[in-house]
């Protein structure tokens, strides 16, 4: 009998006989031959697990390959299977012994990951070239409008303490109306202290509490309906993952890391061109809220709900923006736990197919087809948020319901079913039922002609602006290269060795002379020694009679340094403009600004004169306060009594110095008492505390 020896090169166990000189450890070919002979006999295959043979034992490696980028990979699958890992050799099943082996074999079983069929949250962003507008269909305008128009006051107002000292509420006569950001009479002061709020009211109030929200934007969000509506629409698109942080809505944006896109439905009738906030700023506002912004794990929450419903309490613990972020990040959990159970897709074509199948097929086959049709028509959260194939009213109803059960209930099955009955308008005790998500063929998001024209004009203006920016950059680059360009000459003469300073000065003087409208003579600088002499001819310009209403136009000639061709450049004289500005300034100064017929300068002079007593009084009070509250220790340090350690004075600390400081403080009090008791008319006594 031989003994098994591990072969580290081939990662197999070989059989070595002690008495035979022919079979050695360094010659594995014989063991391979004997192994191949035994593989051919069925008896050897059956006794493989019981007795030790000379067959080399292959090692099976399980390699996990990510198949996400399988389409782009040019590497063959055979190259991936030749990977040797430092795994311990394992026993081969009997099925693997049927194949013949020519040597020590290492087989690897490749296990591929299934490709993701559903859309990822990272490829849902709106992507268009720079300058292309976002139309109504891109931003799902009808869906956003239905969300912000919802009148149900079902969300608890947890923002009262944040607005307690900053807003004065306005009382509405009669019954309380739910005013949303879609209403023309919108004013957040009418509902900021209500106990219950609508979705739009809670959303806009939450945005206004952000730490990154400026004072101006906060006031506009609370008082301006146009700003509040447009900001809520864009914030919702960022919140659900439809807009990434590389989008700007200002036409003259120059950042290379951003792309400009107009939104005609929000910008057409806007007065401010900078009405819309860019998406990086919106993301910063949404992520920096003062409360309820903690990390939320819906998976752990659902596990706690399944274990014990009583221990989970998520009511009023998170803000609505953070909750919407978490719902979109965990779309798979939402689909499995809620949408598959409580949402049913309904379409007319599907109903007709179901009726025909029930009439023709048996009952058992019909039931199977029903289940298959339900699975085929199953919807996801991203389908509801991104696509317009469903009714906007149904989509908004489902999204508000998802936010409601996560913010206002403990997510138990009883409360979830009760919320379904409430949203469907059913009575208590009735079956919970499901949400009906109706398919539609109607195109709700149709752009009118004026919005299409606005988007086209914005695209054209953007291209013109970018072309001007590119021309400016090219002009700057050419100017820099011309200044740094060395002088061109055939031979290096003495003029070439004058130094870089002289050349730079000459080029600067030359460029200055080029900008003047005077005729340019032939340059005698070293730069033009070896060039052909060219006599420049200025284009004749007919002088026009200057008037006050028309601008005087003069032509200046600029020399092209390559061929010395003259290109006329129009230069506008701003004398007429200056005269207009002077007239406007004089009219503004002579304009009567008060009821007494006084001009602006006279009114300012009277105002300064009336404020003189108050200014003197403030001056006196300030001087007395400074003199009274000024620390004595710096004074003592100046006099040389104390050291330079400016600590607060303590009794019986330094003896003589302590007595001196006490005397100084007492003298100050006596002096101040005399000044306070003195008469106000005595100017000589109080001259030191008054302005002369």
Curated annotation (Swiss-Prot):
Compositional bias per record (Polar residues), positions renumbered to this chain: 28-56, 97-109, 513-528
Gene Ontology annotations for the cellular component aspect, listed alphabetically: cytosol; Ino80 complex; nucleus
Source domain of life: Eukaryota
Region annotated Disordered, chain positions: 1-133, 465-550
Positions where Phosphoserine occurs in the chain: 27, 487, 493, 504
Transmembrane segments: none
Function: Probably involved in transcription regulation via its interaction with the INO80 complex, a chromatin-remodeling complex.
Annotated protein name in UniProt: Ino eighty subunit 1
Organism: Saccharomyces cerevisiae (strain ATCC 204508 / S288c) (Baker's yeast)
Gene name in the database record: IES1
């Amino acid at each position: 009998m031989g003994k098994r020896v591990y072969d580290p090169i081939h990662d197999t166990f070989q059989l070595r006989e002690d008495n035979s000189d022919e079979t050695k450890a360094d010659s594995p070919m014989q063991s391979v031959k004997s192994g191949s002979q035994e593989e051919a006999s069925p008896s050897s295959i059956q006794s493989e697990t019981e007795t030790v043979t000379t067959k080399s034992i292959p090692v099976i490696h399980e390699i996990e390959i990510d198949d996400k980028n399988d389409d782009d990979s040019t590497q063959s699958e055979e190259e991936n299977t030749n990977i040797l890992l430092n795994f311990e050799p394992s026993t081969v099943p009997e099925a693997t012994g049927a194949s013949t082996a020519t040597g020590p074999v290492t087989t690897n079983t490749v296990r591929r990951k299934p490709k993701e069929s559903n859309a990822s949250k990272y490829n849902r962003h709106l992507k268009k070239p720079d300058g292309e507008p976002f139309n109504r269909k891109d931003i799902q305008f009808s869906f956003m409008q239905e969300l912000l128009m919802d009148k149900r006051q079902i969300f608890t107002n947890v923002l009262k303490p944040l607005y307690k000292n900053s807003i004065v509420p306005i009382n509405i006569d009669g019954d309380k109306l739910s005013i949303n950001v879609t209403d023309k009479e919108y004013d957040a002061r009418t509902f900021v202290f209500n106990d219950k709020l609508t979705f739009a009211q809670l959303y806009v109030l939450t945005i206004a509490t952000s730490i990154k929200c400026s004072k101006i934007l906060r006031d506009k969000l609370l008082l301006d309906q146009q700003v509040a509506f447009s900001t809520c629409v864009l914030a919702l698109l960022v919140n659900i993952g439809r807009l990434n942080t590389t989008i700007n809505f200002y036409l003259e944006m120059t950042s290379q890391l951003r792309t400009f896109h107009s939104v005609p439905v929000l910008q057409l009738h806007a007065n401010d061109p900078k009405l819309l906030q860019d998406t990086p700023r919106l993301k910063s506002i949404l992520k920096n809220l003062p409360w309820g912004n903690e990390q939320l794990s819906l998976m752990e929450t659902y596990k706690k709900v399944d274990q014990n419903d009583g221990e989970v309490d998520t009511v009023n613990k998170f803000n609505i923006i953070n909750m919407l972020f978490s719902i979109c990040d965990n779309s798979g959990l939402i689909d499995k736990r809620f949408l598959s159970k409580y949402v049913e897709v309904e379409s007319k074509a599907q109903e007709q197919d179901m009726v025909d199948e029930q009439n023709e097929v048996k009952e058992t086959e019909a039931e199977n087809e029903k289940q298959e049709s339900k699975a085929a028509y199953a919807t996801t959260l991203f389908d509801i948020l991104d696509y317009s194939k469903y009714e906007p009213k149904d989509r908004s109803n489902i999204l508000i319901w998802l936010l409601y059960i996560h913010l206002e209930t403990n997510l138990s099955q009883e409360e979830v079913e009760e919320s379904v009955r409430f949203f469907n308008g059913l009575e208590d005790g009735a079956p919970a039922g499901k949400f009906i998500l109706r398919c539609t063929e109607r195109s709700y998001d149709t752009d009118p002609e004026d919005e299409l024209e606005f988007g086209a004009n914005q695209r054209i203006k953007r291209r013109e602006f970018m072309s001007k920016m590119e021309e400016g950059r090219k002009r700057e680059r050419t100017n820099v290269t011309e200044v740094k360009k060395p002088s061109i000459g055939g031979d290096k003469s003495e003029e070439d060795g004058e130094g870089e300073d002289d050349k730079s000065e000459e080029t600067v003087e030359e460029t200055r002379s080029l900008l003047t409208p005077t005729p340019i003579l032939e340059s005698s600088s070293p730069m033009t020694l070896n060039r052909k002499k060219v006599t420049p001819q200025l284009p004749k310009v007919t002088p026009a009679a200057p008037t006050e209403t028309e601008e005087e136009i003069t032509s200046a000639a600029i020399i092209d340094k390559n061929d010395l061709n003259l290109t006329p450049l129009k230069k506008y004289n701003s004398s007429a403009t200056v005269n207009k500005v002077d007239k406007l300034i004089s009219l503004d100064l002579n304009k009567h600004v008060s009821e007494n017929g006084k001009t602006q300068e006279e009114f300012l002079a009277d105002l300064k004169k009336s404020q003189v007593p108050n200014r003197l009084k403030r001056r006196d009070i300030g001087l007395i306060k400074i003199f009274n509250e000024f620390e004595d220790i710096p004074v003592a340090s100046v006099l040389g009594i104390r050291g330079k350690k400016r600590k607060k004075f303590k009794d019986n600390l330094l003896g003589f110095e302590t007595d001196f400081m006490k005397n100084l403080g007492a003298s100050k009090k006596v002096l101040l008492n005399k000044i306070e008791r003195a008469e106000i008319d005595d100017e000589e006594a109080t001259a030191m505390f008054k302005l002369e």
